């Protein structure tokens, strides 16, 4: 089975500013999906979200989630990560994660700005622990 420590999968997920599409189950059972900024860290997918958002409340209630990251031009590719999340409100971890996300998606010069803005009370660090990883890194082959 593929996993996030596979160098090719890790490189694909960590390249540039690709967003992930995170899926979860709403309270009424509907599947929901939204784009997120994310990091690959210690064999997990890490992102932040508001504790009182639909996503934050849903993941607190039901930790099952799936992430899909894709390449939308040739050679077309995707990685899907299925698993369960853990949530943290630790302020140091939150500030660190928010700063690292800011660096990846907005550039090093704006990392601290995004860390201050998003690493605040009421936000969560979400860590997706993979139970299954599916990857197709060259769909034209």
Task: Please place each PLM-identified region on the residue numbering.
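Short beta-strand segments
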Residues: 18-51, 59, 65-69, 78-80
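Hydrophobic alpha-helical segments typical of transmembrane helices
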Residues: 5-9, 55, 97
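Extreme N-terminal tail/first-helix region
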Residues: 1-17
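Charged, gly/pro-rich active-site loop segments
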Residues: 1-4, 78-141
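Short, solvent-exposed aromatic-acidic interface loops
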Residues: 50-54, 105
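Alpha-helix boundary recognition
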Residues: 13-15, 60-61, 119
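Short His-centered aromatic/hydrophobic patch
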Residues: 73
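Residue-level signal for well-ordered alpha-helical positions
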Residues: 58, 62, 139-140
């Amino acid at each position: 089975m593929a996993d996030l420590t596979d160098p090719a999968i890790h490189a694909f997920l960590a390249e540039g500013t690709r967003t992930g599409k995170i899926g979860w189950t709403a309270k009424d059972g509907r599947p929901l999906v939204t784009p997120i900024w994310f990091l690959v860290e210690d064999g997990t997918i890490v992102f932040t979200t508001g504790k009182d958002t639909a996503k934050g409340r849903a993941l607190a209630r039901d930790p099952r989630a799936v992430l899909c990251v894709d390449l939308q031009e040739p050679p077309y590719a995707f990685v899907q990560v299925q698993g369960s999340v853990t949530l943290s409100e630790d302020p140091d971890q939150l500030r660190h994660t928010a700063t690292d996300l800011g660096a990846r998606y907005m550039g090093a010069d704006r990392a601290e700005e995004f860390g201050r803005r998003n690493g605040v009370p009421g936000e969560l660090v979400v860590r997706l622990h993979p139970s299954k990883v599916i990857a197709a890194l060259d769909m034209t082959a």
